[in-house]
């Protein structure tokens, strides 16, 4: 415990805020190349085969990113755009792939929440 005199002389050191998505390096999105496309099983009590991809970013860092929506066209060597945002039931997955940009197609026949899945407006 410091004395009041020590606090006046030196003061307290600010606690540094840790980022939740360090691979983005303070950018909103980053481009990368898929090195592997695979499925993970979620934590208890959930059960599914969640689609994920290993992505080597332009910064040289390799991360695991979630592929949202039903169905995807991603393969190895596809160029993708990733954003921050973790998947609660997949440990270690802290990034999302943005649908409808670069080599990633939007979700087909999506009616609601289209902007989140890169789906075009359906013909009336």
UniProtKB/Swiss-Prot annotation:
GO molecular function: rRNA binding; structural constituent of ribosome; tRNA binding
Keywords: Antibiotic resistance, Methylation, Ribonucleoprotein, Ribosomal protein, RNA-binding, rRNA-binding, tRNA-binding
SUPFAM superfamilies: Nucleic acid-binding proteins
Record-listed 3-methylthioaspartic acid modification sites: 89
PROSITE patterns, sorted: RIBOSOMAL_S12 (PS00055)
UniProt keyword annotation of Kinase present: no
GO aspect biological process, one term: translation
HAMAP family: Ribosomal_uS12_B
Miscellaneous comment: The streptomycin sensitive allele is dominant to the resistant allele in L.biflexa.
Listed name of the protein: Small ribosomal subunit protein uS12
Classification of source organism: Bacteria, Pseudomonadati, Spirochaetota, Spirochaetia, Leptospirales
Gene responsible for this protein: rpsL
